[in-house]
């Protein structure tokens, strides 16, 4: 059994695929069609980051279809990874994939991170998603009503309420199959606990109608748990070569800010906050060279470093990709001296890896829910690096510190 995961950002792709890696699957996350050093033909699970979150809906849908064809979607089980806080073009992408892949089993809940679904609407730590800081930061409007959002994209959708999800395997399977025969194209599933997701996974894994799954890391873990892969237990992590760890915080969520503060306080590592105005102007800004030299000097000396983006009155959520790309270019000379990267915010992680010419990640294990640990391919003249990625609004307050610990506890001494 092989899987194709299509995600709209890098941290989501890794977070979704880690469950399979933990079940022993050979799992690769790709940033490009043919990444150097990664043999996709030998992978049990290929997770494609199509980087479509900020695209126009039509362009995002086309990018997903391209990934489906390129990833041999017809011969693999498909998991369409979406953001558990419904950012991006998930509804348009799901509607585009449905004619090819079948009935959409939609369950974005991720209880381990406080994301749940009730009455077909999303909640974050018990609060309606539309009332959360996450939606305010992204300037999103309306209600987080999954059925309505799918219907707005022309997909006939219906709700599978919690009492049906908990009615038992046979009832759940028969209900979903019956809805498909009635012409329903998407089933939106309530879920409050990991047991609810496990029930959905078990009931839908053997449906007698074509189907694919639409969700976050929560449902992906539930689907991966009973899978048997030849690799068995995940391979132990080899000790990385000696060298510093660079932590990039490109997300401006309050959660990421608290995580960065925790990392700084517990490690005492050097930190740098880069004003957005420097990143907007790039190398032409008067302070660019000084900031770049500060980053490079610290990492060249073998010291770990925390770099984050500041905020100002001109902040616009839509400029995230631009700021992330500039942060990557600012950090690139120093990145060459690192052996580890921690990146919070999928756009930040992708920008840094792309700038460094890294097109794939081999997933290893999970630091905590939503924080996977990976290795980059070893290429001629380019040593492998350890990478931890995290969505901006995910994780415990100590998430970055836990990621740093996971990297440094086995770090080999510098030569």
Swiss-Prot record:
This is D-threonate kinase. ATP binds at residues 251, 345-348, 392. Its EC number is 2.7.1.219. It comes from Cupriavidus necator (strain ATCC 17699 / DSM 428 / KCTC 22496 / NCIMB 10442 / H16 / Stanier 337). Disruption phenotype: Deletion mutant is unable to use D-threonate as a carbon source. Belongs to the four-carbon acid sugar kinase family. The gene is dtnK. The keyword Nucleotide-binding applies. It holds the Pfam family NBD_C. One of its GO terms (molecular function) is kinase activity.
């Amino acid at each position: 059994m092989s899987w194709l995961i299509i995600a709209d950002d890098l941290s989501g792709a890794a977070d979704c695929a880690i469950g399979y890696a933990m079940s022993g699957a050979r799992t690769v996350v790709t940033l490009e069609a043919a990444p150097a050093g990664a043999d996709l033909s030998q992978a049990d699970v290929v997770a494609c980051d199509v980087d479509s979150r900020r695209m126009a809906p039509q362009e995002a849908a086309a990018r997903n279809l391209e990934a489906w064809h390129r990833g041999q979607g017809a011969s693999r089980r498909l998991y369409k990874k979406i953001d558990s806080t419904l950012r991006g073009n998930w509804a348009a992408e799901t509607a585009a994939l449905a004619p090819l892949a079948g009935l959409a089993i939609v369950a974005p809940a991720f209880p381990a991170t406080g994301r749940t679904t009730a009455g077909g609407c999303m909640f974050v730590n018990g609060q309606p998603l539309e009332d959360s800081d996450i939606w305010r930061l992204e300037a999103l409007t309306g209600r987080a009503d999954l059925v309505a959002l799918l219907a707005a994209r022309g997909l006939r959708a219906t709700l599978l309420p919690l009492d049906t999800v908990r009615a038992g395997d046979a009832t759940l399977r028969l209900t979903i199959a019956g809805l498909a025969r009635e012409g329903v194209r998407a089933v939106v599933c309530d879920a409050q606990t990991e047991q609810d997701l496990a029930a959905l996974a078990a009931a839908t894994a053997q449906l007698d109608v074509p189907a694919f799954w639409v969700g976050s890391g929560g449902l992906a873990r539930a689907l991966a748990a009973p899978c048997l892969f030849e690799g068995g237990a995940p391979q132990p992590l080899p000790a990385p070569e000696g060298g510093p760890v660079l932590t990039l915080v490109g997300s401006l969520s309050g959660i990421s800010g608290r995580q960065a503060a925790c990392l700084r306080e517990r490690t005492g590592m050097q930190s740098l906050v880069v004003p957005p105005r420097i990143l907007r102007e790039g190398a032409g800004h008067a302070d660019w060279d000084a900031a770049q030299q500060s980053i490079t000097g610290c990492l060249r000396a073998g010291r770990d470093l925390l770099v984050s983006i500041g905020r100002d009155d001109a902040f616009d959520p839509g400029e995230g990709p631009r700021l992330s790309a500039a942060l990557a270019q600012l950090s690139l000379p120093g990145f060459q001296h690192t052996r580890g990267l921690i990146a919070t915010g999928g756009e930040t992680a992708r920008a840094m890896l792309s700038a460094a010419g890294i097109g794939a990640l081999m997933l290893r294990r999970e630091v905590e829910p939503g924080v996977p640990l990976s290795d980059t391919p070893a290429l001629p003249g380019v040593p492998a690096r350890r990478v931890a990625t995290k969505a901006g609004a995910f994780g415990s307050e100590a998430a970055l510190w836990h990621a740093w610990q996971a990297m440094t506890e086995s770090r080999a001494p510098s030569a």
